[in-house]
Every structure is written in C-alpha cells, then in structure tokens.
Amino acid sequence: MKAIVQVRGEVNQEQGVRDTLEMLNLDRVNHATLVPETDAYDGMVTKVNDWVAHGEPSADVVATLIERRAEPAAGEGDIDDEWVADNTDYDGVEALAEALVDEETTLQEAGVSPTLRLHPPRGGHDGIKHPTKEGGQLGKHTTEEIDTLLEAMR
C-alpha cells in the first residue's frame, strides 16, 4: 500500500495531471490517500510524481492517521475503535490499519472517506520544488521518510 500526499498546488498543472489527481481523490494541497500497489496506480503516481510525495507507510502511522484524520464516508463523526467495530469487519483501528497495509481492504471498502485531510507539516516542508534526492519533498520516499512526513502532518 502507498500513501500519497499532494504537496504542490494547481498552478501550472497540466490538465492530465489534474485529472489524475482527481482520480486519486486528491483535490487540494495537504490531502492524502492510501492506495494499493497495482500497475494502474503505479502509472498514476508516476504521472503526478512532481506534485506529490509518496511511499509505503508503517501500520502504526496509518493507525494514527485513521484515528486523527479519517472521516466516515457517510455521515459525520470520529473514527475510533468503537466505530470500526460497529461498521467494519475489524475489531479496532489497529486491526484496520494492519489490513490496509497488507492490502486486504481499502478505505472505501471499510466505509471511510478515501481522502484524509491533513494539517500542514509541523516545522514546514523540506522544500516543495525539489525531489527527495535533492533534499526536497517531491517523489518517492522511504518508509521512514514518509512516516516522518505523515507524523508531522497528523
């Protein structure tokens, strides 16, 4: 599973990039989504690589994101262990996070909104104009790097 975070805005975006971000359920800066690792999603991520940060997060970070930032797809409320037990096949947030990381389910299948609206990163971005190889935020991150970014945006 990959976490994809939109880091850059719409200025100077081509229409194809905008359409791809919309297909990924990313319509604003600092929004994130969790997608399975398939060829179709890999192609989409390649296309929007200059606008997003992406990587494979750990289950602990996914659980934190679900508890703090996830919203039910229908209705309002917070996602906690009780909500997960009542509305999904899983016992709690940790079990749902493990299932997401293992690609047993998706956010939509679990009844959770596919878009996670995150806070801007505490301490700021490392740079939204440069890829990770040059010390920026754009492109592919290691598990530790994406975990650090998502923790800062929790």
From Swiss-Prot:
A Gene Ontology biological process noted in the UniProt record is: translation
One of this protein's Pfam families, by short name?
Ribosomal_L30
Gene3D superfamilies named among the record's database cross-references = 1.10.15.30, Ribosomal protein L30, ferredoxin-like fold domain
Its domain of life? Answer: Archaea
- Region Disordered, as annotated, extends over 114-139
Where composition is biased (Basic and acidic residues), the residues are 123-133
Q: Which UniProt keywords apply?
A: Ribonucleoprotein, Ribosomal protein
Supply the InterPro entries for this chain.
Ribo_uL30_ferredoxin-like_sf, Ribosomal_uL30, Ribosomal_uL30_arc, Ribosomal_uL30_euk_arc, Ribosomal_uL30_ferredoxin-like
Question: What Gene Ontology terms describe where this protein resides (cellular component)?
Answer: cytosolic large ribosomal subunit
UniProt GO molecular function: RNA binding; structural constituent of ribosome
Please describe the quaternary structure of this protein. Answer: Part of the 50S ribosomal subunit.
| Similarity comment | Belongs to the universal ribosomal protein uL30 family.
* Entries under HAMAP family matching the protein: Ribosomal_uL30_A
Its name, as the record gives it, is Large ribosomal subunit protein uL30
Organism, as annotated: Natronomonas pharaonis (strain ATCC 35678 / DSM 2160 / CIP 103997 / JCM 8858 / NBRC 14720 / NCIMB 2260 / Gabara) (Halobacterium pharaonis)
Q: Which gene encodes it?
A: rpl30
